[in-house]
Amino acid sequence: MIKPSLDQLMHLVDSKYTLVILAARRARDLQDGKHQMVESKSNKPVTIALEELAAGKLFFERGKPTPLG
């Protein structure tokens, strides 16, 4: 079973697309050498990013929409 579960993570974000973007950006940071915010048994950046989100270490803020033109 995958930990943390998708159900657990979906309660923390507004959509699955936000979850994917958040995890991908954090995984990229980890690959670039940024410090892990949680201890993990995994060495995979995406798994570590999802564990950080589940632990409440990652946050996001929705930006204001801008007018087109």
UniProtKB/Swiss-Prot annotation:
It comes from the Bacteria. It holds the Pfam family RNA_pol_Rpb6. The keyword Secreted does not apply. GO terms for biological process: DNA-templated transcription. Keywords: DNA-directed RNA polymerase, Nucleotidyltransferase, Transcription, Transferase. Signal peptide: none annotated. GO terms for cellular component: DNA-directed RNA polymerase complex. Its EC number is 2.7.7.6. It catalyses: RNA(n) + a ribonucleoside 5'-triphosphate = RNA(n+1) + diphosphate. It is an enzyme of class 2 (transferase). InterPro entries: DNA-dir_RNA_pol_omega, Pol_omega/Rpo6/RPB6, RPB6/omega-like_sf. The keyword Metal-binding does not apply. GO terms for molecular function: DNA binding; DNA-directed RNA polymerase activity. Promotes RNA polymerase assembly. Latches the N- and C-terminal regions of the beta' subunit thereby facilitating its interaction with the beta and alpha subunits. PANTHER family: DNA-DIRECTED RNA POLYMERASE SUBUNIT OMEGA (PTHR34476:SF1). The RNAP catalytic core consists of 2 alpha, 1 beta, 1 beta' and 1 omega subunit. When a sigma factor is associated with the core the holoenzyme is formed, which can initiate transcription. Belongs to the RNA polymerase subunit omega family. This is DNA-directed RNA polymerase subunit omega. It comes from Symbiobacterium thermophilum (strain DSM 24528 / JCM 14929 / IAM 14863 / T). The gene is rpoZ.
